[in-house]
């Protein structure tokens, strides 16, 4: 029996456990909540919010408020300075650095040892378990896993305490089993300079038998492009004949799918999406033919949801998982084994089915355009761009969009800044198809576009090569888990990028 079959047999029991998601949703989630309450009952937060008196879900909601990062920041700051038993039992030594809030450049998300084991690493194991269950002929453990990560640094110089990208924390604490199959070395994986890291990873990986990839699609594409440059090969399977799967997450895969299809032409190449955020591992594809992800309901995460049409109300409706409806857009609220209590993560999701609960990520609570009542979300944008690319043969590297509130002629429109990997023959046709698709899938956008009365036809501005990388670099955010803001209701991001785009030399285009 080969190594992959041995691993698959070992994980078969876990696949059976996941099958219980079909009829035990409420039971499993209430069990998670009970465990979280019990583990935090003697913490400062637990004592302040009466965890000793919490008997069920209703009593939990009455004693615990919904929180954003700003509400928990003072507690997290104290934890980062070494205080114990604040939001979670014991001392939390690791903090995932995430994109900031209105008031802060960065958020620092606590990652407890319990959160590492029962959420993040469990998610990685389950991704492998479900993939092998769908691909019994897999040979992924015949070779190595190319896993991309960010970097970390000491946390206030406290012993054994780190702050950095979640991926770096996962690599730092990885088991010997994972390290045996993983490349690059930990030293290279945790380098802070992404450009140096990319070069060293590519040089090392080209000599290995890589069978699987894990990382953010945009940064992985950058590394793989360098691998192809060094090797002189046409397709990735010419470098690594055993390549079979890419476990991806962090950003939507849709804009990159065609580029990966051209990079890896083998018909048996698979792509499996995971939803692993700094705050926890929440979902993964259990059917590679279905873009929806399975919500993982027996980890250290208790889920609640706020309908997006309630989000701005003083007392919005909040429902547990078993109270959601399919086809409705929700903001996700989580309570975790790292002390994030009823925490608004900032992501929005839409459920596609129940029992088991499957969903798609539709965007961010703060990444949308609703300047004129059009309520455009990231999922709309991704689907619109996909249609435009398919119709025109274009390929997209990166993009962002924002409203133009009123130009010199008193007209309002959406402005899209797009870096093409392959430009469409007609930018006008591309823009027209994108506009029509957005009207087809978003009735609010369609209404505002009616006869150009409220909203004019969208505008597309081609970005020079590497504009978005350069913008991230100017923010000290090149590489790792940093992402381009896809949609914004203000012009802050796009104006900065347009300024960099306008100052480019002709050869940059």
Model regions: which residues?
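Active-site glycine/GP-rich loop and adjacent strand/helix microenvironment
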Residues: 1-52, 60-67, 74-82, 169-509
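Active-site diphosphate/adenylate-binding microenvironment
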Residues: 27, 31-95, 106-111, 118, ...
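Short alpha-helical patches at coil-to-helix transitions and adjacent helical residues
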Residues: 92, 117, 121-122, 217-220, ...
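Conserved helicase ATPase motor motifs in RecA-like P-loop NTPase domains
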Residues: 96-102
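Short small-residue beta-strand/loop micro-motif enriched in glycine and branched aliphatics
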Residues: 104-109, 368-371
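Long, hydrophobic, well-ordered secondary-structure blocks that form the structural core
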Residues: 110, 114-120, 246-247, 278
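Short, basic alpha-helical nucleic acid-contact segments in DNA-binding proteins
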Residues: 123-128, 289
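Conserved AMP-binding loop of ANL adenylate-forming enzymes
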Residues: 130-176
